């Protein structure tokens, strides 16, 4: 109780909505899961309008029926807003890792359930969270820095060598739901400028600063497109399914025309695996 009260006091001090604290969960049956649920209930007792949060690793989200039962007990709190997060153990080059289809489908089922009564935000989601938007989330977390677009535990560590580093440059390809290296984007531009503009979603960002705003605009457009299908989950899934189909076809063309520049692993990470997550979720819900 005292911990939740301190958190709420600090949030009130900066005029932020009350967001209940939580723990990173590995299993719905672990002691931490019971503690997290107790904190959620305490927070609701203090402020019935408090937002709630749910953070889990892949093992948590992949726990099937046990996950669904746990989420059902949380949905009963009827929080106005739920913020959910896929916690990664390791992040490589900030490329989405949706290899564990079961885990991401579990997150989507959770969003589906919570969205029946609450608004749902997927934190640290970016383009990898589009299947969760189809499942009912209306907002995804992102940022101007690539490290803000996925939950990387190392991002919260103190850097023992804060020397000057020159990061690689990237360009968001909105039509591909992807972020590719700038030299790849330039190769696509040289191959076919009109095709490049279409899949990029606009002119080539001349600088990394412009690219940051371009990225957020492309992501916002994708989320709005899915939200535009309305609350019906089947319609939202159909909207994203069509988007992934177009991206896959464009990737096939690029891989054929620009071999060794646009590669199969790019398509797999940004199009194929997210599409598999969408279909796994849709199948589980009869969509």
For the regions a language model picked out, list residue spans one by one.
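Active-site beta->alpha loop and helix N-cap motifs at the rims of alpha/beta catalytic domains
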Residues: 1-82, 86-88
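Glycine-rich phosphate-binding active-site loops on the catalytic face of alpha/beta enzymes
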Residues: 15-22, 124-157
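Alpha-helix-loop-beta-strand connector modules within alpha/beta enzyme cores
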Residues: 35-51, 102-120
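Glycine/Thr-rich beta-alpha phosphate-binding loop at enzyme active sites
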Residues: 67-108, 135, 149-164
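C-terminal structured domains
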Residues: 142, 147-221
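C-terminal extensions of enzymes
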Residues: 193-287
